[in-house]
Regions:
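Glycine-rich phosphate-binding loops that contact phosphosugars or nucleotide phosphates
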Residues: 27, 31-156, 160-166, 180, ...
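Phosphate-moiety recognition in structured ligand-binding domains
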Residues: 4-5, 246-302
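Short glycine-/small-residue-rich flexible loop motifs, especially phosphate/cofactor-binding loops
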Residues: 192, 238, 274
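Conserved phosphate/anionic-ligand binding catalytic regions in large, soluble enzymes, centered on
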Residues: 4, 45-49, 189, 266
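Active-site phosphate/pyrophosphate-binding segments
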Residues: 2-3, 7-33, 122-223, 232, ...
Length: 302
């Protein structure tokens, strides 16, 4: 099975999975204040979601930042997120921590063995190594459930809406994906999907920071995708960006529920590059064909 087909299968597997996902017991507010979630790539986005949904009681961190400040590792409860469980920086953090829990698909991994506890992510997949989809939504919702109570409803409706919205996007030479509090981490994840699946020049930023910085690298014909519900401020942004010749999209989740919005924007982030890959008769994800880049990455992170 080629990686684009595997990705599509994994995306579809999320629908039944999310209807029966097993969530974690909520940490007390006291314990949350001494908790750090740590990860890299998609897993850092999951950690940032936990931080946002906890109202910043917990902190999200990059593993190398923690290794440069080992007192943070020793004085807090650390949750290390890694689907493979073999990323070397996370394993190093685990070895310095007193109270450390792995959140991983691979409960036999180096990370799981280095941690005192393990939350095993149990989800179905195509069995082919492809761009992360169901693994991200599983780890993200697992992390959020440790800091906030929620229920998941209307998955099929969210999927249909995300599928519809994904086909409206016109991709320019450069893509800017912007969001705020609960959606900025998904913007990060979304940019990663455009990198991994299409090899697209994509950027993620908080909405306010984009207006201060990223906007000045935008050119007419570039694409801006706003991950936030409609409001007066965003309407003004859209009006001004369109005057610059930018393609501006604001996918509509159709709900004000924050968890539902995260799921919607996650699905949208998977379906949009998948749609373009299939449209261009692409069989493999970009990260598979870009062997030199993949080898350089793997050489450093494993």
């Amino acid at each position: 099975m080629k990686t684009i087909e595997a990705l599509e299968n994994d995306i579809l597997l999320q629908i039944p999975y999310l209807q029966k996902i097993k969530l974690q017991k909520l940490l007390s507010e006291k314990n949350q204040r001494k908790t750090i979630f740590c990860g890299s790539g998609d897993s850092l986005a999951a950690a940032l979601l936990a931080e946002a949904f906890s109202n910043f009681r917990v902190r999200a961190a990059d593993p190398l930042d923690l290794l440069k400040n080992k007192s943070m590792i020793k004085n807090n409860d650390v949750y290390l997120i890694s689907i493979s469980g073999n990323t070397i920086s996370n394993v190093k953090v685990a070895k310095h921590a007193k109270r450390v829990t792995a959140i991983t698909l691979n409960d036999k991994s180096k990370l799981a063995k280095a941690c005192s506890k393990c939350i095993h992510l149990d989800y179905p997949s195509s069995g082919v190594f492809t761009s992360g989809s169901i693994g991200f939504i599983s780890s993200a919702l697992t992390c959020i459930s440790l800091v906030s109570k929620f229920k998941i409803r209307g998955i099929m409706e969210l999927f249909k809406r995300a599928l519809l919205e994904s086909k409206k996007i016109k991709i320019g030479k450069k893509i800017f994906i912007i969001g705020n509090l609960h959606t900025f981490p998904v913007a990060m994840y979304s940019a990663a999907k455009f990198y991994e699946i299409l090899g697209t020049d994509a950027y993620y930023e908080r909405i306010e920071q984009f207006l201060h910085m990223g906007l000045f690298s935008a050119k007419s014909g570039d694409t801006v995708i706003i991950f936030e519900e409609k409001n007066f401020h965003n309407s003004r942004i859209i009006k001004n960006l369109k005057k610059l010749g930018l393609n501006v999209y604001q996918p509509n989740p159709g709900t004000r529920n924050k968890i539902a919005q995260v799921i919607f924007f996650t699905l949208f982030s998977q379906l949009t590059p998948l749609f373009y890959a299939k449209k261009n008769h692409q069989k493999e994800c970009y990260f598979v064909t870009a062997k030199k880049l993949r080898n350089a990455s793997s050489d450093m992170i494993y």
